[in-house]
Structure formats: C-alpha cells, structure tokens
C-alpha cells in the first residue's frame, strides 16, 4: 500500500511539531524516519497511524484519504517502543487480539485465530511460547511478540516506533537483520522511527532525515551519506568537520590563503566548508591546502583521529590519519579534503 | 543476624544484604501479637468456655443466623455496589480534568473522617418516609430507612473510599500506549475498557471489594440509626452482640463474635488467595 503525506502540519497547543511535511512512500518500501529527539519523527509516525490528527494537510493510503478515518478503520500495525503488550493475556491471546475484536462475519473462528497466532509465532521464531505471559519473556522476545501482534491484522502499513530502542546492542543488531528478512519475506510497507543513524542507513531502503519539525533530506543510504544537502544532514549523519571560509572569484579562501579548491558555482562571500575527517588527502608542502598544528590525537580502532588548530583563529577541525603517520603533538599537518561541500554561512 | 536460624529444618529465604531483617520481623510479630492476636485469642478463649452444646445452641438460634445473614448479605451487596460506582468515580478522577476535581477527590475521603453515627443520622433523616429522598421513594413503594435496604445504603456510604482509593493509583499507572495499541488493532472504546483495561485493574478491584466488605461487616455506628433494628428483619450481628452484652450474657456475645471472626477470616483468606493467583499470572 502506498502512503502519501501531503502538506501536513501538526501543532500541540499552538506549538508546531511539524511544519508542512510531505512524503511519498512506495508500496513495499522500508523507510526510516531519522532525527534527533524533538525533530517530529514520532509525531509523523503517529499521524500516519491515526493516533494524532493533523492540524492541516492530508494523509493518503493509496488513493483513499485516510485523514478522516479513525484509528480502528485505518488498519495499520503499530509497534510501540515499550511493546505495550497486554499483561493479562498469553502470547497467543496477545497476537490474536486484533482478530478477536472484529465483529460479525469478519471475525475468524477461534480455531483459525489460534492457527494464525502460532503461524506468526513461527515467523518471529518464538514457536512454543503460546502459553507464556509477557512478564515471562525477555525484552527481545516481547518486541517480536509485539511485531507478530501488529502483523496479525494484515495491516496496510507497518509502523514501528523506535523498535529496538530499549534493547541492548547485541540483541539490537540481531533483530535488525531479522526485521529486514521479515520485511523481504512479507513485503509490508514499513515505516520505522529511529535516532540511530547506523540502524537507519543499514536497514532502510530510503532514509528520511528530520530536524525541528521539517524533513531535511530523503534518499538512499548512499545519497544521504555522500551528498548531504544541508549542514544539518552533514553534521548529523556520520562524522564531519567544518571550517568557516570565503568564496572569491570561484576559489575557496581560508583566512588570506587559497586552499586549492575551486567552487565556480558557489555564491561569493562567507561560507562554511564541510568534509569527512576520513576523506582527506595528506600533502607534504603547502601551496593551496589547509595546514594546522596537532592539538590532540586519539587512537580510534584502525586509525588515528587528530584535532588540528588552523590559522590565527585557532579553528579546530578533526581529520583521520593512518596509524603509522608521524604526526605528533605540535607538528604541522597539511591536507586537502577529498569530497567536500560548501554551504553559505548562516 | 542472630534471629535468622541457619540450621537444618526449614530456612528463611535469604533476605537482602541490607541489615535489619531480624529486627523488623521481630518487631512486626510482637506488634501484631499485642494489637491483634492477644485480644482475638481472648475472644476465642472466652467463647470456648461455653462448651460445644451451648455454643451450637447460640449459633443455630434463628435470631443469630438472621443477624449474621443480614450483616454479611448487606455488606456483600454494598461492596458490590461500591465496586461498580467506586471504579467509576476513580475513572472520572483519573481520566478527566474538570473544575472542582480536587474538591471531588477530597470529598471521597469524607466517609473515612465523619463519625459514623453522624453519617447514620444524616442518612436516616434523608431516607426516612418523610425525609427529602424518602418522600420521593415512598410513592414508588420503596422503603429505605428501617429496612435491610437502609443498611445497604449506609454501608455503601462507608465503603466507597476503600474502593476508590485502592483502584485509583493502579488506574493512574495504566500505560497510554496499551490503549493505543488496542485501538490500532481495531478494538473500539468498549472493547478496550472491558478487555484490556479492566482485567488489568482486577487485582485492585478485588482488594477494594474485600476492604469495603470487611468494613461493612464490622460497621455498627451508622447502621443502627438507619436499620430500625427489628430482630429477625433488620438487626445486624454487631448489634446483637451489644444486646447480649447489655444482658450480661458475655458467653453468647463472644460466641457470636467468634463466628463472625471465623467467617470474615475465611472470606478474606479466599480473597487473598485469588489475589496471589492473579499476581502470579500477570506479574
């Protein structure tokens, strides 16, 4: 089922949580909503589910306007961060709940509901736990029961709010791979919220980066990482360093020296240069480069991360050096960014 | 830790590393013995001096049986009424924000504080055939004051806060997400309340019921004013005990008291077992 969010605005007591957000989700896609807390990602997810009503704008499921439908009619599967399982029901009863509350002829017979529940338990690899109560399960198992419960109603869309947020790192990684498998097998259109970029980039077909109630960028992991379209995305996704620079005659200047990068299409004047610390070319001499003194140096896994003080302003930037590089305290290092991007100074 | 025996036989479950288990357990036992156990065993001992035949004669006396039936029956009915409306009051107080909510909240506790005799007299005045409410009920043929129905009304008044105050905190802890989850799964409002919310509240409701019930069985002050106290019809067991005392018939008084004690204990024990069972299941 395609989902289209059209110019949605949401205010909570006059405070805007989302400004004019539009998003197209293709059928069968796995989409991540990524952003820091307060960016509106959970609000957007809850609007799609119908747990909140938009102040303005519409949400379409396929060609149908879903914004006027109640939560019950929307037929979405929602998985909550803290699972929200029904404590007084067994695992099987939890999973069958959505079918049991149906009315009249749309309610399958009890036998069928039981069969469906154990089928879903097989799918989430928890066969044999039908009779357990949620209190008797581990966090990862509860999360899987919550997912099975959401899938039992054959939802048009599957929505997950920080699905792995409350689990430890090991279980998270496992469940992540497993969710991808389930998605590939069942083909539900799936939207999940996360603040963990690794999770978003690894798992999703497309990532929606959000900040302060707006969508900053939508794209594949490659798009988002390699060509961020705003300073926020550059800073939020992956490591980045930035320097205040000036653009004159299509050349980039740091203080009073050109650094050997040309930007013929950039507007003249103050700007900020962004680059990845690991994507730099080290130089020996320095005519047209960035040079600085090493202020601090740390060993990070396979590389060495150094902080350089640049120019009279003592601007600090981080770059990565090979472990064997002789740069020690106070020594000078010259480099030029490989892939970089300029954004006009705010 | 000199009080925790480590020898053979059964052992205490190893308490936490925080010291004080021996002291606090010892104090609790001593305190409960002094406050509850000694007075009650005195009661049993006194009634035991009767001998079986005499005890049985008192226990099987029509008047005693009727009084016990009225006491336990009305207390049960009143507790049942309180469970329904007490839960409703708690729901309103927890779920809705309205002007005067704090005042209503405070009002719930009034039956705790008010002298029971005052409550009894006030209720009698209202429900008497010429009282404000009694006057309205009279043409319908409903007589409240001076009947068992009046006893139920008094016990409902006395027992309400027990239900509200036990259910309210548990209701406040209900996770919003659980309701939302049920809604996304297609459950309507009624189904959410009956299938998701109330089963979770059941242990608290049972506790509230047993407290209101226990209070109702023992209630004296408010009931004697409204009950009319007709032997065999609207005479409660506690009153019968007082009557026997006034006749200096101490053995009979203690015998009735011992029967009440035994019945109450059994009922509260059953309620407790139900609680433990449901807690074990739902964790």
Swiss-Prot record, chain A:
InterPro entries for this protein: AAA+_ATPase, ABC_SmlMolc_Importer, ABC_transporter-like_ATP-bd, ABC_transporter-like_CS, Mo/tungstate-bd_C_term_dom, P-loop_NTPase, Sulph_transpt1, TOBE-like
Top-rank lineage group of the source organism: Bacteria
Cellular localisation: Cell inner membrane
Catalytic activity of the protein: sulfate(out) + ATP + H2O = sulfate(in) + ADP + phosphate + H(+); thiosulfate(out) + ATP + H2O = thiosulfate(in) + ADP + phosphate + H(+)
Classification via SMART domains: AAA (SM00382)
Domain ABC transporter per the UniProt entry, residue ranges: 3-237
Lipid bilayer topology: Peripheral membrane protein
GO function terms (MF aspect): ABC-type sulfate transporter activity; ABC-type thiosulfate transporter activity; ATP binding; ATP hydrolysis activity
Entry GO CC: ATP-binding cassette (ABC) transporter complex
Keywords per UniProt: ATP-binding, Cell inner membrane, Cell membrane, Membrane, Nucleotide-binding, Sulfate transport, Translocase, Transport
EC number(s) recorded for this UniProt protein: 7.3.2.3
UniProt feature coiled coil, ranges: none
Keyword Nucleotidyltransferase annotated: no
Binding site for ATP: 35-42
UniProt cross-references to NCBIfam families, sorted A to Z: 3a0106s01
Similarity comment text for this entry: Belongs to the ABC transporter superfamily. Sulfate/tungstate importer (TC 3.A.1.6) family.
Subunit structure as annotated in this protein's UniProt entry: The complex is composed of two ATP-binding proteins (CysA), two transmembrane proteins (CysT and CysW) and a solute-binding protein (CysP).
Entry function: Part of the ABC transporter complex CysAWTP involved in sulfate/thiosulfate import. Responsible for energy coupling to the transport system.
Protein name: Sulfate/thiosulfate import ATP-binding protein CysA
Organism, scientific name: Mesorhizobium japonicum (strain LMG 29417 / CECT 9101 / MAFF 303099) (Mesorhizobium loti (strain MAFF 303099))
């Amino acid at each position: 089922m395609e989902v289209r969010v059209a110019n949605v605005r949401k205010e909570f007591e006059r405070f805007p949580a989302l400004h004019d957000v539009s998003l197209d989700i293709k059928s069968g896609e796995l989409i991540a909503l990524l952003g820091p807390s307060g960016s509106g990602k959970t609000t957007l997810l809850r609007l799609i589910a119908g747990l909140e009503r938009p102040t303005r704008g519409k949400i379409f499921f396929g060609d149908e306007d879903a914004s006027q439908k109640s939560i019950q009619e929307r037929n979405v599967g929602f998985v909550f961060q803290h699972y929200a399982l029904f404590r007084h029901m067994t695992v099987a009863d939890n999973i069958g709940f959505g079918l049991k509350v149906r009315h009249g002829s749309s309610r399958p017979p009890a036998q069928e509901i039981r069969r469906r529940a154990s089928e879903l338990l097989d799918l989430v690899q928890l066969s044999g736990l039908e009779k357990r109560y949620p209190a008797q399960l581990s966090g990862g198992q509860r999360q899987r029961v919550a997912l099975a419960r959401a899938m039992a109603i054959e939802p048009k869309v599957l929505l997950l709010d920080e699905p792995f947020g409350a689990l430890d790192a090991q279980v998270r990684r496992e469940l992540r791979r497993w969710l991808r498998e389930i998605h590939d097998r069942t083909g539900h259109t799936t939207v999940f919220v996360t603040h963990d970029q690794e999770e978003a980039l690894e798992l999703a077909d497309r990532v929606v980066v959000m900040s302060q109630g707006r969508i900053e960028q939508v794209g594949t992991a490659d798009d988002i990482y390699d060509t961020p379209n705003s300073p926020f995305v550059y800073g939020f996704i992956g490591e980045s360093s930035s320097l205040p620079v000036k653009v004159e005659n299509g050349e980039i200047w740091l203080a009073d020296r050109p650094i050997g990068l040309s930007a013929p299409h950039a507007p003249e004047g103050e700007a900020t240069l962004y680059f990845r610390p690991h994507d730099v070319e080290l130089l020996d001499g320095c005519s047209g480069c960035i040079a600085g003194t090493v202020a601090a140096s740390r060993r990070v896994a396979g590389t060495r991360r150094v902080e350089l003080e640049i120019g009279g302003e003592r601007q600090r930037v981080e770059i990565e050096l090979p472990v064997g590089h002789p740069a020690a305290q106070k020594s000078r290092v010259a480099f030029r960014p490989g892939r970089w991007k300029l954004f006009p100074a705010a | 830790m000199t009080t925790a025996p480590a020898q053979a036989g059964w052992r205490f479950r190893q308490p936490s590393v925080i010291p004080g288990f021996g002291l606090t357990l010892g104090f609790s036992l001593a305190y409960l013995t002094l406050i509850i156990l000694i007075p009650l065993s005195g009661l049993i001992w006194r009634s035991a001096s009767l001998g079986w035949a005499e005890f049985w004669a008192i226990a099987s006396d029509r008047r005693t049986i009727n009084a016990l039936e009225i006491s336990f029956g009305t207390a049960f009915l009143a507790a049942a009424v309180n469970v329904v409306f007490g839960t409703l009051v708690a729901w309103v107080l927890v779920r809705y924000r309205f002007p005067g909510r704090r005042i209503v909240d405070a009002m719930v506790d009034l039956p705790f504080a008010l002298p029971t005799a005052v409550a009894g007299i006030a209720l009698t005045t209202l429900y008497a055939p010429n009282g404000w409410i009694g006057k309205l009920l009279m043409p319908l043929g409903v007589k409240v004051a001076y009947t068992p129905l009046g006893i139920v009304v008094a016990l409902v008044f006395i027992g309400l806060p027990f239900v509200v105050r036990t259910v309210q905190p548990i209701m406040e802890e209900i996770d919003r997400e659980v309701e939302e989850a049920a809604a996304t799964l297609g459950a309507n409002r009624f189904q959410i309340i009956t299938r998701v919310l109330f089963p979770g509240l059941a242990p608290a409701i049972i506790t509230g019921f047993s407290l209101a019930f226990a209070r109702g069985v023992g209630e004296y002050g408010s009931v004697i004013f409204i009950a009319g106290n007709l032997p065999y019809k609207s005479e409660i067991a506690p009153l019968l005990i007082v009557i026997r005392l006034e006749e200096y018939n101490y053995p009979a008084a203690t015998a009735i008291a011992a029967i009440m004690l035994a019945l109450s204990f059994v009922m509260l024990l059953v309620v407790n077992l139900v609680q433990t069972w449901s807690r074990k299941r739902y964790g």
